[in-house]
Regions:
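N-terminal low-complexity, Pro/Thr/Ser-rich intrinsically disordered segments
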Residues: 35-70, 228-232
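Acidic/histidine-rich, surface-exposed loop or edge segments in extracytoplasmic proteins
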Residues: 51-58, 119-138, 219-233, 246-249, ...
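Second-shell loop/turn segments in exported
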Residues: 56-62, 137-145, 227-237, 251-261, ...
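A well-ordered secondary-structure block
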Residues: 119-200, 291-323
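Amphipathic alpha-helical segments
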Residues: 62-81, 146-164
Length: 323
């Protein structure tokens, strides 16, 4: 008999399972954060303290309304002298009283600062200016006037004429400046300014000097003699100032300078006192004697003589300009 053979059963082979690749987890990357950069802060500069003022300038020096005495002396040096002025609490710092090369300058000082200035000089210019209060440096300038300006240019620039209550030689019937006047006037933000020409100079009546004073000073106190005080010391100072201003103008015009003479001074004082005590104003004395006779009475030999007199002017500046 045939033996029965069981068929060989192929073993069931499970297919090899390819292991699924393990997913590599992408690392969590935090987005790059741009660092917050604070804008560079420019430090705020401390504003510069400034002063708007009226400035008088020469080739190498200047002075302005509101300037401290310390700054004034640093630039100009010590004054030749300090005069008491008739305006209340005002002192005049006198520079170059006898100089033929430097500008003649009277700086009015009150409360340790400059409140006025007067000059007769070549080559000056006045400005509306802005000054640094910290270092005294000029920041900005706008020209107001300069020496040598013609009469017509003053009119064109809008300067007007002051009245006779300020300068005796002027004609009060004129409300506006015109060619040939002797003074021009302008009010700035902080000062009253007067510029002077000479009607008799034979030329174009150009500007030879100026006077400015702070707006804090009233015109009454600076111009009217009824608001002023007079002592012997103030009167003696005024005499010297009149002498210096007269020579400053003569120097400006290229003329020989005057010299003081004691006997002539005595004759002039006596006549002034006589006019004041007896309430008159004229060259001849009440007894009829003339100026020349007064010189002779003092022992002065002369070949020619002249005299200027002035009444009603408050200070030396008004006296000289009034002539």
């Amino acid at each position: 008999p045939t033996a029965m053979v069981k068929p060989t059963v192929a073993p069931t082979i499970k297919p090899s399972e390819t292991p699924l690749p393990t997913e590599t987890a992408a690392p969590t990357v935090k987005p790059t954060t741009k660092p917050t950069v604070k804008p560079t802060t420019v430090p705020t500069a401390t504003p510069v303290a400034t002063m708007k003022t009226t400035q008088l300038s020469f080739a190498k020096k200047s002075v302005y309304i509101g300037e401290s005495i310390t700054a004034l002396k640093a630039e100009w040096g010590e004054p030749e002298r300090i005069d008491p002025l008739p305006q209340k609490s005002l002192y005049g710092y006198i520079y170059n009283g006898n100089s033929q090369t430097e500008p003649y300058l009277i700086v009015g000082v009150k409360g340790e600062k400059v409140v006025s200035y007067f000059t007769i000089a070549k080559n000056f210019t006045a400005y509306d200016a802005v000054i640094s209060a910290d270092d005294n440096e000029t920041i900005q300038q706008t020209k107001l006037i300069q020496q040598g300006a013609s009469a017509q240019s003053m009119i064109d620039a809008g300067w007007t004429e002051p009245g006779t209550y300020e300068f005796d030689a002027l004609d009060s019937s004129k409300s506006e400046a015109r060619v040939g006047t002797e003074a021009y006037y302008k009010l700035t933000d902080n000062a009253y300014i007067y510029a002077f020409s000479d009607y008799f100079d034979g030329g174009d009546k150009s500007i030879y000097g100026m006077y400015a004073f702070s707006g804090e000073c009233t015109k009454y106190s600076m111009m009217y003699r009824t608001y002023m005080t007079f002592t012997d010391e103030i009167l003696r100072a005024a005499e010297q100032e009149v002498y210096e201003m007269t020579n400053a103008y003569r120097n400006y015009m290229g003329k020989a300078l005057f010299k003081l003479e004691d006997r002539t001074t005595t004759a002039a004082r006596k006549h002034s006192e006589d006019m004041a005590n007896n309430n008159y104003f004229q060259h001849n004395s009440l007894d009829g004697s003339k100026f020349s006779a007064r010189l002779t009475a003092e022992g002065i030999s002369w070949s020619g003589a002249g005299e200027n007199i002035c009444a009603g002017a408050g200070d030396a500046i008004n006296m000289v300009i009034g002539w």
